[in-house]
Amino acid sequence: MLFGKKKEKEQRSVLEEEQMQSPFRTIIKNLLENKLAMGGLIVFVSIFAMCFILPIWFHQDLNYQDPTQKNIAPGFSFLSVPSDLKDNAEVIEFGPTYGVGVDKDGYVYEWGQLTKNLKKIPADMGKVVDIAVGQDHVLAINDKGTLYTWGFNRMGLNVIPPELKGKKIADIEAGYQVSVVVTEDGKVVSWGNTSAVDISTANVKDEKVKEVKANIQTAIALTKDGKVISLAKKETALDNVPEEIQGKVEKIALTDKAAAAVLKDGTVKVWGNNHNHIFSVPEEVQGKAVDISGGRNHLVVVTEDGNAVAWGGNENNQAKVPAKATNIAKLASGYYQNCIIKEDGSVVTWGLKGYLLGTDNLGRNVFYRILKGGQMTMTVGFIAVIIQFAIGILVGGFRILRWNCGYPSYASGRGCRIPSVYPAGTDPFCFDRK
């Protein structure tokens, strides 16, 4: 009923010769005449192609985990900078699933997947001049040097330490449920979930700090005299700052497992763990670097001619710089997203836009997992069909062998064939030749 009336087979005489046709042609003919079977075949081929061809471009490491990307809803809004900000941006920063920007008039914008607390932007901040974005909270300072924070409100993260009251702020940094602030006199203050993030301001108590960079594990500081100091309490690979760069550093950046610095002569130095070949600094940036930023597993450098060069992890195209990223005035990278603000105030972004089907509780892309699961299912199904086919050939061949052995040959006057229609009470397989 759903697929049309089934075609009736033509009634033929039992003595009428039937045209011989190979089994394969018979199968194809019956398949083409059966709309339901054809529909099933099309669906099967589509699923097969999706499971075995798409993974050529969409790779998924079965051991991959990322706590910053877990349980994310489907969508592609991570890089959706509001239109009012695209040509009027002053500062833009990224969290794991969202972005925050400030325009030249000091107004704050947010986009992406936001928690309820992230949407509660303080209304009385005045003209905001700088922001820092963490896992799920934001820091901001206005033109008077006053500090504000909103977002995640546990672990004391929403409470600004009293020692910062009346202090003017020089630099702010937001990490994984931790905030770090540098005052104008070079002192460092941190607060938040310090049990999860290894940060000790005691490491720089006798130093005048210029800026701080944090990742999801710890932080490093750059002093005003060009030295880099790790803020970790425990020994890490980031502690191994090359001696030859101390006193010569202009800019610093962090990935999850490595640190990088731009020196006064424009060269770039990377140390820590060489994940994603992060130590392989492109030759075209050496001696020409003026700024640097880092995401989870990649680095981006701005050269003196205003262009950007990126390297490291590229699973979300975070290290694939678009051609229009030129005439760069400011650079920002966070997690798997990047942004540059051009000299005319326009914005260019690249990197992770979002997830088609979201992520699971380990931060894995659900769509990629479906492709991997489909490969396994299709492989098992293919093996099962091969086994079934082999069994059919063996059993069918055995039955034919029995028939051939059980009767004389056709030349002796008795043979076998399968007519389309035969009278009731007659042997459907064998007949006497007259």
List each model region and its residues.
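Generic hydrophobic transmembrane alpha-helix motif, especially the helices
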Residues: 387-392, 397-434
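Conserved core positions of repeat-based scaffolds
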Residues: 98-101, 110, 137-140, 149, ...
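Transmembrane alpha-helical segments of polytopic membrane transport and secretion proteins
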Residues: 1-39, 87-90
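Periplasmic/extracellular loop-to-transmembrane helix junction in inner-membrane transport proteins
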Residues: 29, 60-91, 95, 123, ...
